Amino acid sequence: MSHTSLPVDAHQALLIGRLWVPGQGAHVVAVTPLEVLDLSGLASTCSALLELPNVATRVRAHVASGQAKTLASTAETLAHSDAAQRAEAQAWFMAPCDLQAIKAAGVTFVASMLERVIEEQARGDASRAEAVRQAVVAVIGDNLRNVVPGSAESARLKEVLLAQGMWSQYLEVGIGPDAEIFTKAQPMSAVGSGAMVGIHPGSQWNNPEPEIVLAANSRGEVVGASLGNDVNLRDFEGRSALLLGKAKDNNASCAIGPFIRLFDDHFSIDDVRQCDLSLHVQGPEGFVMQGSSALSQISRDPLDLVSQAMGKYHQYPDGMLLFLGTMFAPTQDRHGPGQGFTHVVGDEVSISTPQLGTLVNRVTTSDLAPPWTYGIRALMNDLAKRHSQS
């Protein structure tokens, strides 16, 4: 990992993250191109920091006042954050969130909506995917591209597809009134940039999902954004939608980072709406796959997805990180004609967009990835210890 992890305009970006400090635990930090600055004087957790009114202004003022002491060099810490180079005595970047719920919206792009239907029709069997894809596209074609979810037009299309035997639970959440919102991972369980990401060892058909992740506080205010990899098991979910939890939530199966960029005069939700994500997968055997996902093609506005995830009917007192979904659904053959894409151990996955930087992870299986051991209790113990020593 290097300075390419930072946004292209890092000199003006307001980046917050979490730093693992040996002997002390997790610190909430601000990250500049040169330094990693301690924000403990403002908040002890990322969740608490994002609760502050006018958080971007508060963080800038705190840094400008000189109260945020330097904890580490940004370049050195990025290098140490690579799991292959990490040492116990060195500080490294964790996932930037902590106590927040980690939620995700699914089936928010037409391209990935069709792939979910294909998985369902193929019953999770990758060898059947290409034949099913041709059959599904022949019936549905481009009929979904201009449909507004929940509209009268979407209701009419549903009736047509029901009559043709092509209606699907994925189309219901894709173009119906209610978005799919699910729990991607538990608070504190996400891994950061440089960490290993885990695939369930029983999966034979899986893929990365490059996504924008919004950071919202308990009031439902979206205050920043990050990058995420919603690691997905296509075969598990394809066999049954009731296996969504097993398909999505495994050890190290959720990556977020490298940082949360706070909204300010230089970066806003309108910039998020126009983000183009790039994906690069480099396999140990020389396989290369590239893809992209354009937020401008999303079928539901990002703020609408936030309002469907939290509100008067569902509160998150510690805030929420929300994956927005992806239009990327890989079909490039890797192991033979018609087999499509699946991960192998050792794949390096890079997800990037200019204003948020680059999230980089290597693939292993969830049973071999470092186990999740640093939870809420451990964090509270570390914070109490630091408080007693101050």
For each of these PLM feature ranges, what is it?
Residues 2-19, 58-283, 384-388:
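Active-site microenvironments in enzyme catalytic cores
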Residues 19-24, 32-33, 219:
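Short, flexible beta-strand-to-coil junctions
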Residues 20, 29-30, 215-216, 352:
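Well-ordered beta-strand positions
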Residues 26, 31-66:
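N-terminal cap/recognition module
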Residues 35-37, 43-46, 230-233, 358, ...:
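Short, surface-exposed beta-strand-loop junctions and turns on beta-sheet-rich folds
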